[in-house]
Amino acid sequence: MKFKKNDEVIVIAGKDKGTVGRIEKILVKENKVIIKDVNMVTKHNKPSQQNQEGNLTSVEAPIHVSNVAYLVKKASKSSAAVYSKLGRVTNKDGKKVRLVKKTKKEIQ
């Protein structure tokens, strides 16, 4: 998985296209990420003995990593947001580092 927790990303496909957020959780086996306040779905909770009335809660649903890109620069009044896919490369020290493909810069 090329993304890490707390990376700032932009959604590039789906109903929340163009939305910017931070990664809260990574689901490695499913190849999905959960982004704060993005892809909200309504969950119906059944009534139980502790909770006599059922209720509706909003929860973030996972998004596939192919629909998310790393945010390089936020949008401003004069320019659009710059985003790119991530890659991995081995640097001179022999360590694997994450690389922004568009700008060819390493990130931590």
From Swiss-Prot:
Any one cellular-component term (Gene Ontology): ribosome
Family membership = Belongs to the universal ribosomal protein uL24 family.
Question: SMART domains per the record?
Answer: KOW
According to UniProt, the name of this protein is Large ribosomal subunit protein uL24
Subunit and interaction comment = Part of the 50S ribosomal subunit.
Asked if the record carries the keyword Ribosomal protein, the reply is yes
Q: Which NCBIfam families match?
A: rplX_bact (TIGR01079)
**Alphabetized PROSITE patterns for the sequence:** RIBOSOMAL_L24 (PS01108)
Q: Which UniProt keywords apply?
A: Ribonucleoprotein, Ribosomal protein, RNA-binding, rRNA-binding
